[in-house]
Amino acid sequence: MIIANNKKAFFDYFIEEKYEAGIELKGSEVKSIKAGKVSIKEAFVRIINDEIFIMGMSVVPWEFGSVYNPEERRVRKLLLHRKEIKKIHEKVKIKGYTIVPLDVHLSKGYVKMQIAIAKGKKTYDKRESIAKKDQERNLKREFKNNNR
């Protein structure tokens, strides 16, 4: 079940490889995320000392939590196998590649994040993808009208 989606990532980047990572969270953060109070629009991923962290992810403090609720935009560790981290690190060293958060979802009761290795699109690529979507939309509309 997808809780938060980063639609802008598909528009701004060419997605190459996807990975599912766990997120190191506090108890009240889990409850808040399950309530849908999370945003990954400004989030980005960094590799620091062979560990992957998500920064800029906003988790609204749980309303029934105590005064010890964690910060809304604190740095959270992503949980991946060491082989996956090494593979991602090698790919990101290449110029033009970055790690992008795609969505936050539940998997077997655990909060997971789908991240991807991506390459940035140029403005002409973005225009091309918009034109392609418009063309597909027009084709669907024509087929729908022809079937009536």
UniProtKB/Swiss-Prot annotation:
Pfam families: SmpB. It is found in: Cytoplasm. InterPro entries: SmpB, SsrA-bd_prot, SsrA-bd_prot_CS. It comes from the Bacteria. Keywords: Cytoplasm, RNA-binding. One of its GO terms (cellular component) is cytosol. Residues 128-148 are annotated as: Disordered. GO terms for biological process: trans-translation. One of its GO terms (molecular function) is RNA binding. Required for rescue of stalled ribosomes mediated by trans-translation. Binds to transfer-messenger RNA (tmRNA), required for stable association of tmRNA with ribosomes. tmRNA and SmpB together mimic tRNA shape, replacing the anticodon stem-loop with SmpB. tmRNA is encoded by the ssrA gene; the 2 termini fold to resemble tRNA(Ala) and it encodes a 'tag peptide', a short internal open reading frame. During trans-translation Ala-aminoacylated tmRNA acts like a tRNA, entering the A-site of stalled ribosomes, displacing the stalled mRNA. Belongs to the SmpB family. This is SsrA-binding protein. It comes from Fusobacterium nucleatum subsp. nucleatum (strain ATCC 25586 / DSM 15643 / BCRC 10681 / CIP 101130 / JCM 8532 / KCTC 2640 / LMG 13131 / VPI 4355).
